[in-house]
Amino acid sequence: MTQPANPRRPKRGTWTPQPETAALLRDSGNPINGVGENFPRRPSPFFWHPTDQHPFGDLQLIARKNSRKCPGSTEAFQAAYAYPELIEPSAERNEAPIEALTALVRDFALAHEADEVGIALMEPNWVFEGYTIEHPRVIVLALAHNYERLREVPSDETNGIGVCDVGDQYARGTRSSYNLANWIRSQGYQADPYPGPMAGALLLIPPAIAAGLGELGKHGSLISPRYGSGVRLAGVTTDMPLIPTMPRRFGADEFCANCQVCTQACPPGAITPRKQMVRGVERWYVDFDKCIPYFAEAASCGICIAECPWTRPSVRPKLLTTMARKLGGGLSQE
């Protein structure tokens, strides 16, 4: 069945930013993100970091203001910013075998709102410049969107369903990551939570990919084999001994190379057709200078992840089967 057109979505190529919005994009974000750089480096603080750490603070404030105009959005995001208190690590350490600790972490996270759990060894280039993370491991939590609510994006003063679901998943990420960090601390280990939507020390998508939660999509977001692009992420770094989960290849990257759905759905035309070199890695990249003005005006947008074929519950199983056949097997561990 064909889905009805969303009246809040302008067609690609028909949208231009308001003059006052365009005036706030005083610098290009693409060089700051490392587009065209051939050598790996740590990412620079960027959108959703404190506004004094990057040149786009005014646009960030406009994005938040427009988001909060949507019905229910303020309450949804207030829950995301309701950070529980962190306890001090216990003086008594749980010395169970690494296999048992890994199972305990996974079971605790899944019992406390996380929909998927992955574990990776920390990499220096996952930490933003100016920040420090000393812990050797990162646990990444995936929080799945409600598809029927997500497909309502973008939101505005008449309909806040989509952006409220974004806020709700970030709130689950806050609770889940803080609860897990406190549980790990209760076992005698160090642990720090890193939920969204505000950015902190930890870049979340690369460790999510390394931990087997998905692949990077053409739209610059994670594609999960279980939930498609309809996920939000939170992280917990720790010194607890844990067994890493392995990256998984299930065909999203190959599919994105030929798919044009998100490219055609993006009103400002920000999704590029080919991979680019970004901080020494050839990868999918979204043009920040085109994306963010629309993102700011459209209450945080979300069109690309809602329109992604992998996000549609009725389509995703067929894609998994088709791509597994093309790859010569099922989900693979690399």
Positions of PLM-derived features:
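Catalytic cores of enzyme domains
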Residues: 99, 106, 115-329
